């Protein structure tokens, strides 16, 4: 049993191709998708795009939620699900609060953890905040480290992670692009722009709010 856990739009984009791949082998792998819905609306958009249906949805998002509230609700919910499902491996992605909490819940239940997009570091615990600490703690807990680049692998080796536990896999964002790039996407805004140049800016970083 392999349980993928994510809660935000960026996680969903990068984990969806992995979920789709796991589901190609139903006889060998029981794929279980669990979402915390740390970002509800943005998460649902991605799930619909990739046609991924969660097996478990904690739906923890609340207006003006604090990090403590997210952590508490996610930890309790994931602990209950893990006790019920008893997966053999938990896969998490990146550096969100969901990532950190899912890893911690797996540790408490003595379940192996695989960390996708492992090894990114700034070495400054407040930049990005709280993501740098989230990914460092997840790195301590993880049994398998799927690093996107050789630089990420070097960071993990610097932290004395075992070389045999590290796999340089590239970034699953490329896989997500390959899944969607052939879609004949149309939108009235794009029709109005025509061939004009466009800048797309997404700015929801905690530091910008």
Residue ranges of model-derived segments:
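Conserved beta-strand elements of the Class I
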Residues: 3, 91, 199-200
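Conserved nucleotide-sugar phosphate-binding/catalytic loop shared by glycosyltransferases and other
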Residues: 27-73, 77
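A nucleotide-sugar donor-handling region in carbohydrate enzymes
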Residues: 34-36, 40-41, 141-209
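Proline-aspartate-enriched helix->loop->beta-strand connector
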Residues: 86-88
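An aromatic- and histidine-rich active-site surface loop
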Residues: 91-109
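A short, histidine- and acid-enriched strand-loop-helix "catalytic/donor-clamping" loop
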Residues: 115-129, 143
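Membrane-proximal helix-turn-helix segments that form the acceptor-binding/catalytic region
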Residues: 131-144
